[in-house]
Amino acid sequence: MAAGLPPDALGRRGSCGTDYGAVRYVGSVSRTAGIWLGVEWDDPQRGKHDGSYEGTQYFKCRHPKGGSFIRPNKANFGVDFLTAVKDRYGLNDKQDVQYGTGNTVVFGTKTVEFVGMDSVAEQQRQVQLNKLVDISVRECAVSHAGQEEEISRTCANMRHINLSKNLISSWETVIAIASQVQNLETLNVSENKMRFPSTSTLISSTFSNLKVLALNQTEITWTEVLLCAQGWPVLEELYLSSNNITVLERPDNVLQTLKLLDLSDNQLLDGNQLHLIAQLPRLEQLILRNTGISSIHFPDARFGCKTEMFPSLKRLAINDNKISQWSSINELDKLPSLRALQCNNNPFMDTEKNPETLIQLIIAKISQLEVLNNCEILPAERRGAELDYRKIFGKDWLEAGGHWNPEKNKPSEEFLASHPRYPALCLKYGAPEEGELKGRQPLTLKNQLLTLTIKCPEKPEQKAVEKKLPESMTIQKVKGLLYRLFKIPGSELKLSYESSKLEGKEVELDNDLKPLQFYSIESGDCVLVRW
């Protein structure tokens, strides 16, 4: 074995410069002298081959160009946890001079010797380490725990540890470090490609106080998550992005305290996988960004009813997915606690070219939503969205069997499947009147654009802006636009306008359901906003 090469090098994580990888082979290579390490690199572009050389397969790689051979002296197998902490926080032996550890001091012509200065410096280091509560040793080449109980003696007050992007090879190493931290609450071991237990292990109290755990890019599977989770009795936040998790399983008797789950950047088999985690009783936030899901369905609840799945879910992120049908957005109204939604970059959003109408449709379809794509939904904006929705689809409602007379009102199942909230909106605002029922008008050149100046006369700090708006745009939609434009808090807007042709005359825009053209507004006029 080469000098300095760890006896357990095979299978361990290591680095060479800024590149990380796992040792898959230790030994000789044909027609060369000495020992070589066969490394499968995290970044395949760093490699040269699949583990074979001159017709001999020395090790296997997942990528055809993911492997190469390096000499042992080029490999860094890392340091123990405490060494990394001392290096990161400037508390190792090299910094002893700042504590005055020289043994002699000269006073004039006399040299005075101070006995025990080394031990004093060591005590001062101990005190400094014991004060650390939040510790980050990200990218510090940590590979093992070090001497037994050394961490617990030295860093007794740690609560939050960032161990991301190191050289940790197995979950056992994480346990060896964490078991010496009595009150560990937050642990980040992301970007360590490590081995996890494949069978049930003895449950220890290592993570008895752990509330936040990040395992992004660790190659953990959902089965391994559930096995390890037996030791996470009070965990509240679990981050699992970019782990190639495709299939979920029901978490029986584990993760019952979980409030946040991040599964982003894992290509789930289908949306039905979500049903397997739908009974987590305390889950409030679910992050499913870029998981490949194309539909969402809660089959236990009919139109207009609430599902028993995800009973506590308040915040849902489904952005960057393949959801193409509005029916999935309809389904989200079945979630009893949903308050915030992120859904950008899904194909269904391309079905409506006017972004204002798109936002209104989503708001109208999900009754309890308060935040959409990180923007607060104000009461006036919701009211306008629901009134417009009720009007836009009024003709479809009538043709499907809807009627102003409750006894004759029998819309078809097909209509209710497409517009499950429509009956509730009719109850809330009344059935639409015949004069309101105009077909949907796409925003085209036929809808004349008005160039208007928008001012806030009572708010001089707000600069006037110029906007182009279709003359068919209702006052309610204009208000929704202005709420976002001026970031106005939840209050009632009052709009009026001054004509460029009639100086000094101000006309109040007092009917939310009327379009701009109803008030004879023309390009060049000035809209005045007050609140």
Predicted features, each with a name:
Residues 1-7, 511-515:
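Short alpha-helix capping/helix-loop boundary micro-motifs
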Residues 3-20:
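Short coil-to-beta transition motif at edge beta-strands of beta-rich domains
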Residues 9, 35, 57-70, 75-77:
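Histone-fold and other basic nucleic-acid-binding segments
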Residues 19-29:
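Short beta-strand-centered aromatic/proline hotspots
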Residues 27-62:
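Basic/aromatic-rich interaction segments and small domains that mediate binding to polyanionic partners
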Residues 63, 72-269, 273-531:
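Long, contiguous C-terminal flanking segments immediately downstream of a protein's structured core
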